[in-house]
Regions:
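Short, well-ordered alpha-helix to beta-strand connector turns
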Residues: 24, 174-175
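Glycine-rich phosphate/diphosphate-binding loop of Rossmann-like nucleotide-binding domains
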Residues: 68-173
């Protein structure tokens, strides 16, 4: 049993897929198991967000010699991850959380569990805080149309060539990116 990541035809997995075919191995790519509305039934995104956020704070603590956290794999679940994180004292950092998908929302569970204050994009970019804060951004927060129009996500996905990155404004004030 393994997550093959072959349906997207990534070049680095080509040899793996060829070996599976040569050996006549029965393969179910879990990314293709969907319901009647074509929504994936198996996904690990939420857990990737939970563990990724925890590991981000673990790395932050190590890098700045602030605290040491156990590896996520040695703990029993999300509640224990949050309990360990809440024991730490964070400086007044500003955290950018990108996305509202499964990974982003899993990471948000950690931030909210730690009782880190969520702020608006405008406030994040313009204010200083005396506590750790985070902002959750989506594609139109960090991309803008070249012609200056303000449209919607559908336009962004249909016409990505009409947009340029505006993420730099977050890098000027953020300490951590998740």
């Amino acid at each position: 049993f393994f997550f093959s990541h072959t349906i997207k035809k990534q070049p680095y997995n080509r040899k793996l897929l060829q070996a599976i075919l040569e050996k006549n191995i029965e393969l179910y790519d879990h990314e293709t198991i969907v319901d009647a509305t074509n929504r994936r039934l198996i996904g690990f995104g939420r857990y990737a967000g939970i563990v990724g956020a925890y590991n981000g704070f673990r790395a932050f603590g190590i890098k700045y010699d602030l605290f040491t956290l156990a590896k996520a794999e040695t703990l029993s679940g999300k509640d224990e991850l949050i309990t360990r994180l809440k024991r730490q004292t964070l400086p007044n950092i500003k955290i950018v959380l990108s996305g509202h998908g499964k990974v982003g929302m899993g990471a948000k569970e950690i931030l909210d569990g730690m009782k880190i204050k969520q702020v608006s994009v405008t406030d994040f970019l313009s204010k200083k805080y005396s506590e750790p804060v985070y902002v959750q951004i989506d594609v139109l927060d960090y991309n803008k149309r070249i012609d200056g129009q303000v449209l919607n996500n559908d336009d962004f996905y249909k016409n990505p060539q009409d947009y340029i990155s505006d993420f730099g404004r977050f890098t000027k004030v953020a300490d951590v990116y998740i």
